[in-house]
Regions:
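Hydrophobic C-terminal alpha-helix "anchor/cap" residues
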Residues: 408-409, 501
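Short, polar loop motifs at secondary-structure junctions
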Residues: 423-427, 493-498
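Short secondary-structure boundary/hinge segments and terminal tails
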Residues: 449-450, 500, 519
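Positions that flank functional sites
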Residues: 447, 497, 516
Length: 589
């Protein structure tokens, strides 16, 4: 790394030293380990979605075609690394604990990545403070315990660990750094496609410009052209690797590009006028880090080496504001209506951490223990509020029992027909995970190809009423074509939908979960058959999908362990201690 590092002697006080990385990892274990053992993320918004994907890989590793949603869709539309590791661990731990374990790995990798990323700009001590801060970030707790965005957190952690190797390669032409950086970036891409397409650019550009500024530092003797040419080599190799590792993903995107009406999302709101969404998507994720914004702006603009990082942070900060400013829509174009913007707030928080670590260093140097206690209190409050926030800002109803629904679908040949759930929320994915029958609905919007779902601008049919006229029109269209899809059974957890079902010819037959769920059926429906929507992956694509993405993560681990980092060793020359006793003078002999 290029930032100066202070080698401390034996007499430096504890508050004057960098926090060892081992201690930071133990702190992450202490803070998040108990929450994960309590399985708090199980109630997060997308947790059941990721378990659904993982359950399919656990049973059909080399066949990414999943018939359970949308009358059949290809899981090559979502990078598989997270789900494949969950699938492997699920054979020993079950799906719930497998999810917790992979999330814990992501949480442990994040402070390591933040430390290494921050060391590009700040000292070892400031970087260690930044790494500690990453454990308590409100945006991390928001994604883990409310949003359930496990792929996003793992992809960001892997990317942050890989970019310092890109920095070393660009400045020093170190081939070890090239190999390790490429492997980690490919593993990050195999975890989450949005992090690859948008996050990698936002995180990497400050690193590139800093490498140009630092081309002569620490005995390096590179030219601007040399740094840029090596960066181009890295980019070309990365694109080639992505083309191979994620080939089925690009092929699926080519055959079925996303062409559907935009689906509303609260993160695209104006946070100044919609105060509730501003709290949820900005204030809670940023927490006490908002107090550091003046320092970030002043220090980031005043020092030349920090400006690339600051400009990257500033752009990501603005993007994280969603529809509050027109800039995201101008920059992203049609992607604006596809993306959700809580991920940009997470990335912006990560990019701010090196400067926040620098602020912590300044405060501790000046105020000592008082500053340390104050910073620890603010960090703890930030995380505590973010973890507790879903209790006060509920994103879905309390969980209810769906075991009887699953049992019905799995017996007496009921899985020959398709089904639909209404009012099930995130438990739609739980039913899909364990039921053998196929549904016309599903939670992964980008995989939808049924025209009734793509043309109305609403998300899941199970939540139709929350999308107003568009949602109800989509539901009516599906009910109208029930014969075409073999849709015979509808499970209702919200009486709001019952008049529509009765009018459309369905009849109430049974109730489950002490009357909270009712089963509606329609006579005369023929068994379901395959539809023409979607392109089934070939056997070769299945083999590539089942080996290359997870292989990239294994390769990254092996390269990091086998190719040691080339570190410049420094040695402290300590002055002898001063002896205050009077010297004994003797005559020379």
């Amino acid at each position: 790394m290029s930032s100066p590092s202070i080698v401390t002697g034996r007499n430096v006080p504890v508050l004057g030293r960098a926090i060892p990385l081992t201690w930071i990892l133990l702190l992450a274990l202490a803070v998040h380990g108990s929450l994960l053992l309590m399985q708090l993320p199980n109630d997060s918004y997308d947790a059941n979605l990721h378990k659904f994907f993982a359950a399919h890989y656990a049973q059909h590793w080399l066949d990414p075609w999943n018939p359970k949603w949308f009358t059949g869709f290809s899981q090559t539309t979502y990078p598989p690394l997270v789900h494949q590791w969950m699938a492997l661990f699920s054979h020993l731990l079950g799906l719930n604990l497998a999810y917790m374990l992979v999330q814990f790995i992501a949480i442990l990798l994040l402070p390591v990545g933040v430390y290494r990323y921050a060391r590009i700009w700040v000292s070892e001590r400031a970087a260690s403070y930044a790494a500690v801060g990453s454990i308590f970030m409100g945006s991390l707790s928001f994604l883990v315990y409310q949003a359930g965005q496990l792929p996003n957190t793992l992809a960001a952690a892997l990317l942050l660990n890989g970019l310092p190797y890109f920095y070393e390669w660009a400045r020093e032409a170190n081939w070890r750094s090239l190999l390790k950086g490429l492997a980690l970036v490919l593993a990050s891409a195999a975890s989450h496609h949005v992090t690859l397409i948008f996050g990698s650019v936002l995180f990497a550009l400050p690193v590139l410009f800093t490498a140009i500024i630092d081309r002569k530092r620490d005995n390096a003797n590179s030219s601007v052209a040399g740094v840029i040419s090596r960066s181009a080599i890295f980019a070309v190799l990365m694109i080639a690797g992505l083309g191979v590792v994620l080939f089925p993903f690009w092929l699926a995107l080519y055959h079925n590009p996303i062409k559907q009406m935009p689906i509303p999302h609260a993160s695209r709101s104006n946070y100044l006028t919609d105060v509730e969404f501003g709290l949820n998507y900005w204030v809670i994720p940023w927490g006490a880090m908002m107090l550091a914004l003046p320092f970030i702006f002043v220090r980031g603009l005043s020092e030349k080496r920090l400006r690339p990082l600051f400009y990257g942070f500033w752009l990501t900060l603005i993007l994280g504001l969603g529809g509050t400013t027109p800039l995201p829509k101008w920059l992203l174009g049609r992607f604006y209506d596809v993306l959700t913007f809580e991920r940009f707030t997470f990335w912006g928080s990560l990019m701010a951490l090196p400067l926040v670590g620098l602020l912590a260093l300044v405060l501790i140097e000046k105020y000592g223990r008082v500053a340390s206690v104050s910073l620890a209190t603010l960090a703890g409050l930030t995380m505590a509020v973010a973890v507790a926030w879903p209790v006060y800002h509920q994103i879905h109803e309390a969980p209810f029992g769906v075991s009887e629904v699953i049992s019905f679908l799995n017996r007496d040949g009921h899985d020959k027909f398709r089904y639909l759930t209404l009012g099930f929320g995130a438990q739609l994915s739980e039913v899909g995970t364990y039921a053998n029958a196929s549904s016309v609905d599903g939670e992964y919007n980008s995989a939808r190809l049924l025209p009734e779902l793509t043309r109305y601008g609403s998300a899941q049919l199970t939540n139709s009423k929350y999308y107003g006229t568009n949602g109800m029109e989509a539901l009516r269209a599906v009910l109208k074509h029930a014969d075409q899809y073999g849709l015979k059974y509808i499970f209702v957890h919200d009486p709001y939908y019952e008049p529509l079902l009765a009018f459309a010819g369905w009849r109430k037959e049974e109730v489950y979960d002490r009357g909270s769920i009712s089963l509606w059926a329609k006579e005369g429906i023929l068994p379901a058959h395959e539809t023409q929507y979607g392109t089934r992956p070939t056997a070769l694509e299945g083999v590539l999908w089942g080996t290359l993405p997870i292989g990239s993560s294994v390769l990254a681990v092996l390269l990091v362990l086998m190719l040691s980092d080339r570190r410049r060793r420094s040695r402290t020359l300590e002055f002898p201690a001063i002896d205050e006793t009077e010297p004994v003078l003797r005559e020379a002999r």
